[in-house]
Amino acid sequence: MFLRFADRPSDSPYIERVWRARSNGGGPFVSVAACHLELVVTRLADSAMVTVRGPETKASIIECPPDGQWAAIRFRLGVHMPSLPTGLLLDHHDVHQPVSADGTFELHGLRWPLPDLENAERYVDQLARCGVIAREQVVEAAIRGDMQPLSIRSVQRRFRRTTGLTHGLFRQIERARHATSLLRDGASILDTVHETGYFDQAHLTRSFKVLIGETPASVIRQDTQLSFLYKSGRPAPG
């Protein structure tokens, strides 16, 4: 595999995880479906840029440049940018900003230094204080399965406005990613079907072809380079 990843969780109310990646060579990889908003720094031999990356509702093939480095802050679901609707960023409609000679980039009409992942929590707190990011409590409660003093339709509307996804699609993506992690960790296909609540192997396979871009068997064999996956635990109820 030509992409190598490292990551850590965060106790910040804004950050779900921070991760780094490095490519030892170039080539195509499968970018699997994902729910979270990310702030990604890309460093190549002749350039650097910062990307606000939105959710991905389906798997796709991406060409990876050789000898690249990436550092990213993955925000918790419910964290959004009020000036940049998440729904406009879906499926690689990302916003890219060049890094200037002084090592800064523009976001929300302000100049920012590149994030230091060792101090990502402090960096993100500053983003929040300046109004660049905000939390939507309704989305956070919906993920936990909490009762809310709102109609189901109101919750669904605010969930989609904040995340760019329906609550149902969010659950499908998280389930498929969790199933992928189980298979890569050595679980059998039948055990994975049972653990993640798919009806049967055919149901799992159909979901994987859309959201993961591979069959369960090819995931087990690790035939193809996949985008960043990590052990996320059991998806939230809903």
Where are these regions (language model features)?
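Short hydrophobic clusters on alpha-helical segments that form packing/core surfaces
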Residues: 159, 163, 179-180, 208, ...
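Alpha-helical bundle regulatory/interaction domains
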Residues: 1-152, 162-166, 184, 188-199, ...
